[in-house]
């Protein structure tokens, strides 16, 4: 009887040990799994990539988990990159310039083609303002340091005005829309899909979009640490972004139906915003570096950033193997 009891005890002990070993191995595997934290906004290709779920499947093969965090604008997203809450994200042209000026250790990874109609200066439907020149002395809402900041500067210059000729009111998109609806500001400089939403829901009138003034590239950026330690993951990410962009070109209806619920807007508004974007991500070209340098120099001259910047110093150069796969 004592022998049977001992045998049962040993069996139970070995079973417990095996279970503990399995749990420990599973925990170790979980601990070893890396995480790619992506910051996105209510526009652009990353929203589509999130909707499709192809990146998660691709990176799961490499033991990489993907986590997504939404931001209201580019400056806020780049602050997230700077403090280490995300590893990779998308912004317009101006936020990286302000981030570099503030000392953020970020790298430009890739860009989308120009999308100049995807941002605009809007006025209320009944506004007496008919031209950019008539903004002199007026209150203009914008998200400071965002892509539309440069659009406003260029539009004013083109109309013969200086930045000091208007009163900028710096507000994130939701607050800016509220101020626009209340009549607290005379104009609002904004990007899609907020732009399309204001046009469709408020019948806001476009005073000037980016056509002939700005490129309005989407830029993909990463922390220097993440890009340098994980070049293969970054390469896969750019490849997937490009693939989704190519898919969108021939599947606007499906893309719209996938994105609309994610951003909480109607299919009509979403489709217009999707149509206005540029698709076809590429690693950063010398021409794009030159264009970004011009933007940086403009903000330095306006004393909106404190020092001269060199854009080429913050461009990610993918390893040859990664570049060949693109």
Predicted segments — roles?
Residues 29-162, 169-170, 186-190, 212-214:
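Short, glycine-/small- and polar/acidic-enriched structural segments
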Residues 297-326:
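Conserved C-terminal helix/tail region of periplasmic/extracytoplasmic solute-binding proteins
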């Amino acid at each position: 009887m004592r022998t049977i009891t001992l045998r049962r005890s040993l069996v139970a002990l070995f079973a417990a040990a095996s279970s503990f070993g399995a749990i420990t191995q599973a925990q170790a595997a979980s601990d070893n799994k890396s995480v790619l934290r992506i910051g996105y906004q209510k526009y652009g290709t990353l929203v589509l990539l999130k909707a499709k779920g192809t990146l998660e499947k691709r990176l799961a093969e490499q033991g990489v988990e993907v986590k997504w965090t939404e931001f209201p604008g580019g400056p806020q997203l780049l602050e997230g990159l700077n403090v280490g809450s995300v590893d990779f994200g998308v912004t317009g042209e101006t936020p990286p310039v302000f981030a570099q000026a503030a000392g953020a250790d970020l790298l430009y990874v890739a860009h989308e083609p120009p999308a100049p109609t995807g941002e605009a200066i809007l006025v209320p439907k009944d506004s007496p303002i008919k031209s950019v020149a008539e903004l002199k002395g007026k209150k203009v809402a914008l998200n400071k340091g965002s892509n539309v900041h440069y659009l406003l500067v260029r539009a004013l210059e083109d109309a013969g005005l200086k930045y000091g000729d208007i009163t900028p009111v710096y507000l994130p998109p939701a607050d800016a829309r509220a101020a626009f609806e209340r009549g607290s500001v005379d104009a609002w400089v904004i990007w899609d899909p907020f732009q399309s939403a204001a046009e469709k829901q408020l019948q806001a009138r476009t005073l000037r979009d980016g056509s002939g003034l700005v490129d309005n590239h989407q830029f993909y950026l990463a922390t220097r640490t993440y890009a340098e330690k994980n070049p293969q993951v970054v390469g896969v990410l750019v490849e997937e972004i490009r693939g989704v962009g190519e898919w969108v070109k021939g599947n606007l209806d499906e893309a719209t139906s996938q994105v609309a619920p994610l951003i909480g807007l109607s299919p009509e508004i979403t489709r217009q915003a999707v149509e206005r974007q540029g698709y076809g991500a590429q690693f950063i070209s010398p021409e794009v570096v030159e264009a970004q340098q011009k933007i940086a120099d403009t903000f330095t001259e306006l004393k909106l950033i404190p020092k001269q910047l060199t854009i080429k110093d913050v461009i990610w150069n993918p390893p040859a193997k990664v570049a060949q796969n693109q």
